[in-house]
Amino acid sequence: MRNCLTTIILCGLLSLSIEGSAGETLRLATTTSTYETGLLDHILPPFEKAHECKIHVISVGTGKAMQIARNGDVDVILVHARTAEEQFVANGHGVNRRDVMYNDFVILGPTGDPAGIAGTRDAKEALQRIASGKQTFVSRGDDSGTHKKEKQLWKMAALQPRGAWYLEAGQGMSATLRMADEKNGYVMVDRATYLFNRDRLRLKLVVEGDPVLFNPYGIIPVSPYRHPHVKYELSMALVGWVTSPTCQKMIGTYQREGTRLYHPSAGDREPQALSPKP
């Protein structure tokens, strides 16, 4: 009986030891595009191995990611809405935002291109033609970085899209693409998600190259001043990793069918120390 009890105790201690050695879990809220294109599966495992931790990825739109971060329910965010990111930091919710990478947005449309926008480099004019012809347009409609950019373009075009022709998916980018494809409509999408799904779509690329379609991504640790429980040191270690020359090269060489999905943009600057308390 004593030997049996000793065995049970030892097994329990071993179990606790194994559980404790599993390391910390870092909570990362990020865009559906970085998740759906497989980029995170490409760049995160080396960090997890080096730091003996697990990164729990929450894939949502940028607006939702920021809301989760404001609530203190994640440790760090990787998002793509620069103005909103800067406001997020200015309001004390995040610290030490760093550039990570960029690509651009493009507009896809039906092969027949009923709006007649194929080849134009003016995104504002393209949306004006779509609206004037009441051609089907599918929006993310979810306050994501893509949706924020789309709303910016409608504002630039002096239009408020509404009516049966304007559909809101309220879903991630890949799901929105599928909906637009089914409806044979127009849609705005980040280039990486388009390239990742291109072979499954009937829609064709019709608008690209407008500077306003630039799409930068940034990483922001949640403020430990606002939420003392967050894993700030591990978050900053992740910032250091994704902006390091090694990871930046991994980002820059990540391809789909020979085409680069993202362009690194961190440069060689080291991550900053914790900003002064606001």
Question: Where are each of the predicted segments found?
Answer:
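Serine endopeptidase catalytic core focused on the charge-relay Asp
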Residues: 107
